[in-house]
Design a protein with these regions (language model features):
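PPIase-associated folding chaperone regions across multiple families
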Residues: 1-52, 79, 98-183
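Peptidyl-prolyl cis-trans isomerase
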Residues: 55, 59-104, 134-135
Length: 183
């Protein structure tokens, strides 16, 4: 209902649930080590290098599954383990269209049976990817916007119901006294 009521806003952001399917996915990239570069700058890896990368990726997946196994803990694992630039964002690729990624990555993401919360390993020319399917972009964005709106409404209502007073001279941020605000 929220998406429908605000569809113009979402469509203007490229998040049309009736249009092209766009997804959000998290991943942890584990690259093989000890590659050899040829004259063209292409790196090749031995089967032992690929197997070592697969074992490391599988161990990361197993460790994640042995814990809470939530999207948040996956994001933490991505930040700690991925060599991809998305690691700083918890391994998140958002608003991905089919064809944006390698064929193998795309095939996993856009499999018709893919459901929010699915996970797995995918091998591409870049290495092994520990995958987590976050869901359809339009849905995730609408859900986030709705939660933000409800949170803002809650705070606004709370502020309206209770009188608040404050002394700027005693204002502190994160435990640091700011002193006299008029100085």
């Amino acid at each position: 209902a929220y998406y429908t009521e605000n569809s113009d806003t979402f469509v203007s952001q490229g998040l049309d649930r009736e249009g092209e399917k766009k997804i959000d996915v998290r991943h942890i990239l584990i690259q093989p080590e000890n590659g050899v570069k040829d004259d063209d700058g292409n790196t090749t890896y031995s089967e032992e290098d690929w197997e070592a990368a697969r074992v490391k990726a599988q161990q990361i997946l197993d460790d994640w599954l042995a814990g809470e196994a939530t999207e948040d803990t996956f994001a933490e694992a991505a930040a700690a383990n991925s060599v991809d630039s998305s690691a700083s964002n918890g391994g998140l690729y958002s608003n991905v269209s089919q064809g944006d990624m390698t064929d193998e990555f795309d095939a996993w993401c856009f499999d018709d049976s893919r459901q929010t919360g699915d996970y797995g390993l995918v091998r591409t020319r870049y290495g092994y990817h520990v995958m987590f399917f976050s869901g359809l972009s339009w849905y995730n964005t609408a859900k986030s916007a709705l939660l933000s709106q409800k949170s803002n409404n809650f705070v606004d209502n709370a502020i309206g119901q209770f009188e608040m007073t404050y002394d700027l001279n005693k204002l502190a941020i994160a435990g640091v006294q700011l002193g006299n605000a008029t100085e």
